[in-house]
């Protein structure tokens, strides 16, 4: 058996359809897109300024078009199909929502995915989806999302969905306990990703929270399944994150991780995740 840790190589801030093949060609097996809302309606994949150093912050697409394009890349038999593209993270910019818009926004994202990505359950895209929310207070989003899939008779698609409550960032990131509580309120037990990190121009810091999260993931009663670190663009940072035990790297340069995974000392411990790797399964250190 292959006992190496499977690694998700997440291309950061992929918001225009033309960027999808470019990042996959660099070796990404997963993509992250930013979802911007108008009211409670997910309307664009768009980040805006400021963003990571060296990146064009204003590339965008209509959300429905973006999802249909993701579907093409992840549906076997499609001319654009890529076997290695196995997961995408939707970075949901729910900070713009009022409290009473949070649940409807979750319902709307579910409807969009159901129609434009999953093709109403009829041979849609096969990639796994992580819903990343910037505020642990927005757990109603997840409840609304799940409710729609149940109502529409597609509860089975929740097998393909994971969750990442990543903030708020200010005044400081929530504790792991507070994050765990939010998941309970969301009715989520399992399929949990945790992200930790900084913009690519921040000094790296001591990875203290990352190490704490990994310790929690690996503990007997840990609630986290996978941990990814962002934005990791240098060989040295990539190695440091792998050494600590992350499951994923979010990067502006997916080719960097591909290079590291070929190196002695890394190629025997880590490998690029494939579709057969379950993203909701904990791989302990």
Curated annotation (Swiss-Prot):
Keywords: Cytolysis, Dermonecrotic toxin, Disulfide bond, Hemolysis, Lipid degradation, Lipid metabolism, Lyase, Magnesium, Metal-binding, Secreted, Toxin
Known cofactor(s): Mg(2+)
Subcellular localization, as worded in the UniProt entry: Secreted
GO MF annotations, alphabetized: lyase activity; metal ion binding; phosphoric diester hydrolase activity; toxin activity
Family listed: Belongs to the arthropod phospholipase D family. Class I subfamily.
Known catalytic reactions: an N-(acyl)-sphingosylphosphocholine = an N-(acyl)-sphingosyl-1,3-cyclic phosphate + choline; an N-(acyl)-sphingosylphosphoethanolamine = an N-(acyl)-sphingosyl-1,3-cyclic phosphate + ethanolamine; a 1-acyl-sn-glycero-3-phosphocholine = a 1-acyl-sn-glycero-2,3-cyclic phosphate + choline; a 1-acyl-sn-glycero-3-phosphoethanolamine = a 1-acyl-sn-glycero-2,3-cyclic phosphate + ethanolamine
Record note on cofactor: Binds 1 Mg(2+) ion per subunit.
Species assigned in the record: Loxosceles laeta (South American recluse spider)
Record protein name field: Dermonecrotic toxin LlSicTox-alphaIII1ii
